[in-house]
UniProtKB/Swiss-Prot annotation:
This is tRNA pseudouridine synthase D. Keywords: Isomerase, tRNA processing. Substrate binds at F27, N129, F329. Belongs to the pseudouridine synthase TruD family. CDD domains: PseudoU_synth_EcTruD. Its EC number is 5.4.99.27.
């Protein structure tokens, strides 16, 4: 299995280094649910600004303030503790009376707004995230500048970030131990983290191998393609390759790679043979996913950061802004720009 740091680059390995997250204010994330609160219902959506707190900690504190069980507070995604983040929490509080959430106090947190909502906010139920990053101590401004220009056109590999695999790869190691021993895992969180790490690692491997072998945006017979921004896919046939290639070049269609699991992967013929060969050595992880009935799925191989802009504060400091759809990783953008240094080279998002 290829280590995250050794995954193939789309724009070649960066020539310089830089510091990511010298302080929390250098990594700002604003959650975009893609919808507004209903204004009525038994749930309350609460938009929180936080710094130095992880999502679960804040959710538990909110539950305590509202005198409800912790399971009655949900969120769409985890946000990094060592960053400045805006996100929505959802608390089930039936009744007509609206609690005064302006009185909720927690160090490092501030309630920005809240309103009634009809439905529970479920994990993954967000449109995306807006990022504002500051890279400091950049050793090669010209290289970073050119890479930013190239990313606007060609995007970056849509790798799952190193944080998906746990500190020191602990989640992936847990999945491997589980696969090798077949010992039942009762802890639901561990099961989820380990299976997610296994499938993500296999996806990364397929994308890395495709980047090595050929133009990642070159459609081959049997590729599974999806409309940009959509989850469903269809299979490319030889007769359609020229037209499909035009639509891929126009960013109307995205070539996908497998998220391996049980059932058919989605590709056929040449593309399927390539994907199977790319992860042929990882028989234990593949068997684990099938055994645990994790359904195979697809994910776009490339990621195009939207609304990408940047501003050099000086020759060694650059502020970068962009928006990513849910499930994508800002660190997968940063790794195409600089070789990161510091304690926060790999961080949660």
């Amino acid at each position: 299995m290829i280590e995250f740091d050794n995954l193939t680059y789309l724009h070649g390995k960066p020539q310089g280094t830089g510091l990511l997250k010298a302080n929390p204010e250098d990594f700002v994330v604003v959650e975009d649910l893609g919808f507004e609160p209903d204004g009525e219902g038994e749930h309350i959506l609460v938009r929180i600004l936080k710094n130095g707190c992880n999502t679960r900690f804040v959710a538990d504190a909110l539950a305590k303030f509202l005198k409800i069980h912790a399971r009655e507070v949900s969120f769409a995604g985890q946000k990094d503790k060592h960053a400045v983040t805006e996100q929505w929490l959802c608390a089930r509080v039936p009744g007509k009376e609206m609690p005064d959430l302006s009185a909720f106090q927690l160090e490092g947190c501030q309630v920005l707004e809240y309103a009634r909502h009809k439905r529970k906010l479920r994990l993954g139920a967000l449109k995306g995230n807006a990022f504002t990053l500051v890279l400091r101590e950049v050793s090669n401004r010209d290289d970073v500048e050119q890479r930013l220009i190239d990313i606007c056109v060609k995007g970056v590999p849509n790798y799952f970030g190193a944080q998906r695999f746990g500190i020191g790869g602990s989640n992936l190691q847990g999945a491997l131990r589980w696969a090798q021993t077949n010992t039942p895992v009762r802890d639901r969180n561990k099961r989820s983290f380990w299976l997610s790490a296994a499938r993500s690692a296999l996806f990364n491997q397929i994308v890395a191998e495709r980047l090595k072998k050929a133009d990642v945006n070159q459609v081959v017979d049997g590729d599974a393609l999806q409309l940009a921004g959509h989850g469903s896919w269809f299979v490319a046939t030889t007769e359609e390759l020229a037209e499909l290639q035009r639509r891929v070049n126009d960013k109307e269609l995205m070539i996908t790679a497998a998220l391996p699991g049980s059932g058919e992967w989605g590709t056929q013929r040449e593309a399927l043979a390539f994907e199977q060969a790319a992860v042929a050595a990882e028989t234990e992880l593949q068997a684990l996913l099938v055994r645990e009935k994790v359904e195979a799925a697809r994910r776009a191989m490339l990621l195009y950061p939207q609304q990408l802009s940047w501003n050099w504060w000086d020759d060694v400091t650059v502020e970068i802004r962009f928006w990513l759809p849910a499930g994508s990783f800002a660190t997968s953008v940063v790794r195409e720009l600089i070789n990161t240094t510091g304690d926060y080279a790999h961080i949660a998002e």
